[in-house]
Amino acid sequence: MLPIETLAAPPELARSEPAWRLAAASFLIPGRLQREHGQRRLGTTAKWVAVAGWVLIAASAAGLLLAPVAVLTIALSPAGAPVIALTLGLFAAWWFVLGVHTAIVARRVSVSVKAASVAALVMVTVGALLLSSAPPAAATVTVLAARSAAAGFFTDAATPETWQGRWNIALLGGDADVDRDGQRIDSITVLSVDVDTGASLLISLPRGLQQIPLTDDSPLRSIWRSGVYDCGHACQLGFLYPYGEESWAELYAGEIPPGSSAGVEALRDGLEGLLELPVHGSVVIDYPGLAAVVDALGGVVVDVRERLPIGGDENQVGVAGWIEPGEQRLSGVEAAWFARSRMSTSEADRMERQQVLLTELLTQVNPAELALHTGTIADAVRSDLPTGMLPVLLRAADEVGSHGLEMLSFGDIDLEHPDVAAIRASVGDALGE
């Protein structure tokens, strides 16, 4: 317990400084009142605790500027977040108690004061508490919330082995509709990240691609014994997801990792068979989720090449507004329709816009901003990425923000009879194989 004594203030302080001013001054110079009222040890302790706090704040700020990936990796890790939160919590508790003690000393009363004096004391105490304990308490909540969100985004699955020093992640854009049950996949992209440098390649594939080779161990080979997912127009790459969700859950029973689903696993089998590279994880986000993320990040700047509708159908019925050509900072809803609009544009055009939007999001957002909005991101997406991928993904975000990323798009290929060998060769060349 901190010592609380009935103390007389020095005459000059009693005459010239009201209690609230003394309490405020003690926030700037912790322990001042205690030292001036004979409690030198407590006052000195308060001063050095404050110095330690400011040093930690300065070191954290410098770390975020000079080595953001390392700092955020520690702050969001299962081991680091509790330690940081505990430290901040102890600071908050210390400042809370010190604020009460300072207010009591400033009022020159003892713990046995009358009720009327307590009422007068409350206002000073509240001011001290708000000024002193609220920031570290809020920081504690922020760290715990960010870690909780990161835990919701990442899974506890084992970190996968790299493939040629890379991790490959399927980024899937969902398109739910009130007139249609379930969700279909509207955009399919594979992000390939070098685990050492963070250098990234974005591979964009058309959802309507047909004649997809399957992996050797795919459960779908029990249906397509030739090893090729092929039944004409009804067997498109993007259809693997809804088919898996609605019809093939039993085929994938026992093979679905945490955070994934039968639809994601079916699409993973198609991507791995087509590209001949392993897909180590997936992220699924629908258009409302995309809009929420873009809004949380303050919008995204893109170069709009043609006038695009917001809402409406192919006949411009129900259009709520327009996205005009030129460089625009798009809101969440505008960004979703920039990627989604089908009016007067081809599938290749849509793929290009989706790739542009994703690229701009990745290049305009730094790791610190991503960490601040982990809650929104975790609520908007579904992911099966293991926690062990976090440091590499933060490094990739930092690298992309500084140097951009490479892009490979297959928007203009033959959808019905794709040249699979040519697709694989292009991917291999882009990856430097």
Short names for language-model regions:
Residues 1-5, 28, 32, 59, ...:
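N-terminal secretory targeting signals
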Residues 39-42, 46, 73-87, 112-115:
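Membrane-interface helix-boundary signature
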